[in-house]
Amino acid sequence: MITDASIDRIAAREAASFRAANPKSLTLAQQASTNWFQGVPFHWMLDWPSPAPLVAAHAQGAVLTTVDGRKLDDFCLGDTASMFGHSPKPLADAIAKQAGEGLSYMLPTEKGVELGEMLARMFGLPRWQVTTTASEANRAVIRWCRGITGRKKILIFNGCYHGAVDDVFVDLRPHPSGWESKMRASLIGQVHDILPTTSVIEFNDLEALESTLKRGDIACVLAEPVMTNVGMVRDAPGYLDALRRLCSETGTMLVFDETHTISSGYGGHSNAFGPKPDMMVIGKSIGGGISTAVYGFSDEIAERMAKLNASRPSGHSGIGTTLSANALAIAAMHAMVGKVITHDAYRHMLELARRLVKGIESVIETHRLPWHVVNVGARVEFVCADRPSTNGSEARAAMHPKLEAAIHLYLANRGILLAPFHNMMLLSPATQEGQVDRLVHILDAAVTEFLE
């Protein structure tokens, strides 16, 4: 049994070891606090469970090097942005070439024409638009769906995350009479009440899904085909097919945010396993770390969008930014989709994912831990609970933040970098078997110590 006392003891020791091993990172963190708010250029960088964030010097493939000269096997990979490896050569070459030719014209390019064709082939949807982030893509998709359906409401799943999109920050919370929808309490500066226009239900709850959609007032269902931001929650058998059917029957747009679930296979989860959405969003890794994203849709949806666009008064649509589809972003995606995100890359990634899952399951079995492993293709997590979650509420309850943080720091001190959010791990085309085996070996050593 792993006790709180054991967790506290090891966490304190590992924090001291971190300070001793990373003096330059700590010095730079102190220096940065003079000008950067809370010492970092972006406050999420404080989410790492270490005394201070490691300061990166450079990264290549699946190895990150810090300013202290420490090399870490990187399974975080920029929290998916570099899921296909840090600075793959085709991407680096494309960025360098474009840097000498202009970065943003607010004009289309020849590579952009080719990219549209490549996206259609890869993801199976014929029409596309580019944004600067997946958050922006999701905001755009919500606007388009509301516009073409004439409906105000959207439906999301409890525990979801679709970026910095106001409309999705609604949760189900316990109430004396059962459950109630509440705006997320952690939001900063939230003014508008989004509860009247955002419905939320539990993932895999077919009865709630059917009753909500049959009201006929939902513009779109915005969902990951597998939930990945509240831990990982797999779809129950038949649930996604029922979702597709009900959306079609009720005139509701089905939107899959595949920013994370592109880990499932070539063309994303919906192409690997179905069903096909009306619209799809892909961000982060599609640009290999360059800030860009895309959303795709069917010809029928495109016709409805065009009619809406032609019928509205002149003026800003509320969709898009000046830097959307800039030449650098187009060049980056052209290189990634054309030369990096390949069938061969997925074969390697998925094979390593199976190896990692098997290794962690062996650790769990050896130590008789009440844990389990879940994966979405090349995305893997071990969960400190005895059974897989079926919805967001169960996934939240399964989390053990203090233990997860202590394990994360233990591994980081020994050259293994996991994501700071529920210890997610990604396998890239550059990841090697030895890195996977080393992770499993060090996790086994960690568990042995925590059980003492």
Regions found by a protein language model. Name each.
Residues 1-452:
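Conserved N-terminal phosphate-binding loop of PLP-dependent enzymes in the Aspartate aminotransferase
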